Amino acid sequence: MALCCFAFSAPCLHLRSRRSCSSCFLRAKSAAFSSARFLRRAFSSSFLFKYSAICFSSSFSRSFFRFLFSSARRCRSRCVSPRGGAFPPGGPRRSRPRLSSSRDSKPSSTVSSSSLSFNSSSKDNSPSTNSSTSRSSGHGTGKHRNSPTDTKLTMLIISPLPRVWTESSFRIPSLRVWRLCTRRLVPHLWGTMFGPPTSSRPTGHLSRASDHLGPHRWTRYRLSSTVPYPSTPLLPHPENL
């Protein structure tokens, strides 16, 4: 774009002939169009989806993703008002958070609770903010939704979890929650794509046959040998009667 503006605004430096001037202009124009095409390709969804595995494969990329997520959360907390709508063009008014009273119990309180639960790991965890969040969420004296455990669960659900993350080099504190979610939501993938190897699983579970026998087997599931209930008793052979 800078080259295109330079070609439009700056005087022609090559005054030898009109042909050289037009070739310089066409070269700048083609360079500007190629740079715009590259930017359009770089921000397309297919380009980002193609390189998403590379982005989440290294620790630097994971920290960069966390930085992007926190900056987006900070931008959302600045640009979204506590009532759920956008601020006026003059900018947000610098005022203290007002506690919601009984007169303000309107349907917009649910919107404010959902927008505040998105910013659950913000650094402003003062008691007044926590009390206003718990009151506006409508749960009364229960635990407010602005807790760091909700943030961990949200991050685990929306972020991909390749097999490299489950190794001992990268430990997640609440990996048990992720195992429970994947076992309940996608049980047909449990054992092939997600989760640790079979030796570290709890005893008495219904494991996948492909974990032990390979993916191409007729039997779909296999009961573990340490199931809490007894198996079918063997019928006696006729020669032993």
Swiss-Prot record:
A motif (Nuclear localization signal 2) lies at residues 91-98. Residues 107-138 have a biased composition (Low complexity). Residues 86-153 are annotated as: Disordered. One of its GO terms (cellular component) is host cell nucleolus. Pfam families: Deltaretro_Tax. A motif (Mitochondrial targeting signal) lies at residues 175-184. Keywords: Apoptosis, Host membrane, Host mitochondrion, Host mitochondrion inner membrane, Host nucleus, Membrane, Repressor, Transcription, Transcription regulation. InterPro entries: P30II. The keyword Protein transport does not apply. A motif (Nuclear localization signal 1) lies at residues 73-78. It comes from the Viruses. p30II binds to the KIX domains of CREBBP and EP300. p30II is a multifunctional regulator that sequesters EP300/CREBBP and down-regulates CREB-responsive element (CRE) and Tax-responsive element (TRE) mediated transcription. Specifically binds and represses tax/rex mRNA nuclear export. Since Tax and Rex are positive regulators of viral gene expression, their inhibition by p30II reduces virion production, and allows the virus to escape the host immune surveillance and persist latently in an immune-competent host. Belongs to the HTLV-1 accessory protein p30II family. HTLV-1 lineages are divided in four clades, A (Cosmopolitan), B (Central African group), C (Melanesian group) and D (New Central African group). This is Accessory protein p30II.
